[in-house]
Curated annotation (Swiss-Prot):
This is Glutamyl-tRNA(Gln) amidotransferase subunit A. It is an enzyme of class 6 (ligase). Allows the formation of correctly charged Gln-tRNA(Gln) through the transamidation of misacylated Glu-tRNA(Gln) in organisms which lack glutaminyl-tRNA synthetase. The reaction takes place in the presence of glutamine and ATP through an activated gamma-phospho-Glu-tRNA(Gln). The active site is at K79, S154, S178. InterPro entries: Amidase (IPR000120), Amidase_CS (IPR020556), Amidase_dom (IPR023631), AS_sf (IPR036928), GatA (IPR004412). One of its GO terms (cellular component) is glutamyl-tRNA(Gln) amidotransferase complex. Belongs to the amidase family. GatA subfamily. Its EC number is 6.3.5.7. Heterotrimer of A, B and C subunits. The keyword Nucleotide-binding applies.
Length: 492
């Protein structure tokens, strides 16, 4: 079959279980596509054909023996922030250019245990700090919808790989929108789960109180399949929560859109810089949900103006602490011929980290320094609590909150956005991480340049099933999630 890449996860699982094709055939199909198409997209940083085919053969044996899981034999790509035993894990940084992890992240461990086949590792912004995937040490990834545009970030490689049909689904991480914004830019569905729902063990840390892993795929149904594998408590992650798990696939039709109260924050739709096409597509998608029986309720989120300053104190402060371990001594990049220990520290860090990472370390170190700790970091944590309370108050009257995932569609690679402009572009996503809430992006159309637009739905704690179900039903009534970029239509 030449069009295996057009099948949904459910169709792939059915095809494998009914022996219409083997995992080896499916894996070879994707490896051929990667070899042909990825030189243009540049989504993969490491492709692992030998390991992938070994895992595919093991999956075929399990399928034959009748001891397969629901997803045995289906390939996927991992963001290069997840530690993978025996495979390079760089986090997009020169600092970790030659780092090979001695163990698997829990998410990777779980995908392997479920019989999924690892195609390779995909590109990202350096240490997940960025919204474009341009800050990666290996270079920028292209958006499959327009190769001279960014795919978003930091999980831009994950989004580009799925959008170009170079993987059926992929893992991502989200610290301030890094699943939802690239999903929006590339026309995909992407879920950021509640903080603590998916283990962070083996994820290279950026901001430990904000980082969360999640699935990126074409549809809510595809995301639900991957969530069934990766969600759950992990004793190796102290922030992982012991809470009963949902069957996300079985629950896809469990939330009725009829009678659903969707909160529309006034402040979100009056943000300076909100693109007219983005606003129009999001409003059209809300009209569709209203036609399906939902009620649109105007709400106030009065802390909106505090999102960006609060996030850009807390996230860099945690990054400054987490990245202090890279010193040129134990592992990671080490400068050549240091004059003394201080020279080793200084040069290893200044040569190993890119400008955006250095900028955030600098901001964070300043915010944590003795004279400014109370004025900046402690105050930001207090405001963070107010942001969380703002959401909880809203959820007393609505079931979910709607917003764009980003104020614009994808912009050109190299567009001279200054860092502050870039940070302001995160306005719709960062508060979700500050509050630890779940949120999902769904594709809802295109702008005048045929670039995808995304709708973000924010849920209350532990409502991943509800979010997936709402988007699944929306996708039963629309076809935006089935649209493909021209490059994805190419056959290998």
């Amino acid at each position: 079959m030449t069009d295996l890449h057009r099948l949904s996860i459910r169709e792939l699982a059915e095809g494998l279980s009914q022996a219409k094709f083997s995992s080896r055939e499916l894996t070879e199909h994707y490896l051929k596509r990667i070899a042909k198409i990825d030189p243009q997209v540049k989504s993969y940083v490491t492709v692992t054909p030998e390991q992938a085919l070994r895992e595919a053969d093991a999956a075929d044996a399990a399928l034959k023996a009748g001891n397969a899981t629901a997803l045995t034999g289906i390939p996927l790509a991992h963001k290069d922030i997840f530690c993978t035993k025996g495979i390079k894990t760089t986090a997009g940084s020169k600092m970790l250019d030659n780092f090979i992890s001695p163990y698997d992240a829990t998410v990777v461990e779980k995908t392997k245990a479920a019989g999924l086949v690892t195609l390779g590792k995909v590109n990202m912004d350096e240490f997940a700090m960025g919204s474009t995937s341009e800050s990666s040490y290996v270079g920028a990834t292209s958006n499959p919808w327009a190769l001279d545009h960014v795919p978003g970030g930091s999980s831009g490689g994950s989004a580009a790989a799925v959008a170009a049909d170079l993987a059926p689904f992929a893992t991502g991480t989200d610290t301030g929108g890094s699943i939802r914004q690239p999903a929006s830019f590339c026309g995909l569905t992407g879920l950021k789960p509640t903080y603590g729902r998916v283990s962070r063990f083996g994820i290279i840390a950026y901001a430990s109180s904000l980082d969360q892993a999640g699935p990126m795929a074409r549809s809510a149904e595809d995301c639900a399949y991957l969530m069934n594998v990766i969600a759950g408590h992990d004793a190796k992650d102290s922030t992982s929560v012991k809470k009963e798990l949902d069957d996300y696939v079985a629950n896809l039709n469990n939330t009725s859109v009829k009678g659903l109260r969707i909160g529309i924050p006034k402040q979100y739709f009056n943000v300076a810089g909100l693109d007219a096409d983005v606003k129009a597509r999001v409003e059209e998608s809300l009209k569709k949900l209203e036609e399906m029986g939902a009620a649109l309720v105007e709400i106030d989120l009065n802390m909106t103006e505090a999102y960006v300053p609060t996030y850009y104190l807390i996230a860099p402060a945690e990054a400054s602490s987490n990245l202090s371990r890279y010193d040129g001594v134990r592992y990671g990049y080490r400068c050549e011929n240091p004059a003394d220990l201080m020279d080793l520290y200084k040069r290893s860090r200044s040569e190993g980290f890119g400008p955006e990472v250095q900028r955030r370390i600098l901001i964070g170190t300043y915010a944590l320094s003795a004279g400014y700790y109370d004025a900046y970091y402690v105050k930001a944590q207090k405001v963070r609590r107010l942001i969380q309370q703002d959401f909880l108050k809203a959820f007393e009257n609505v079931d979910v909150i709607a917003a764009p995932a980003a104020p614009t569609t994808a912009y050109k690679i190299g567009a001279s956005l200054d860092p502050v402009e870039m940070y302001l572009g995160d306005i719709y996503t960062i508060a979700v991480n500050l509050a630890g809430l779940p949120a999902i992006n769904a594709p809802v159309g295109f702008d005048k340049d045929n670039l995808p637009v995304g709708l973000q739905l924010i849920g209350n704690y532990w409502s991943e099933s509800q979010l997936l179900s709402i988007v699944h039903q929306y996708q039963q009534n629309t076809d935006w999630h089935t649209k493909r970029a021209a490059i994805a239509e190419e056959n290998a």
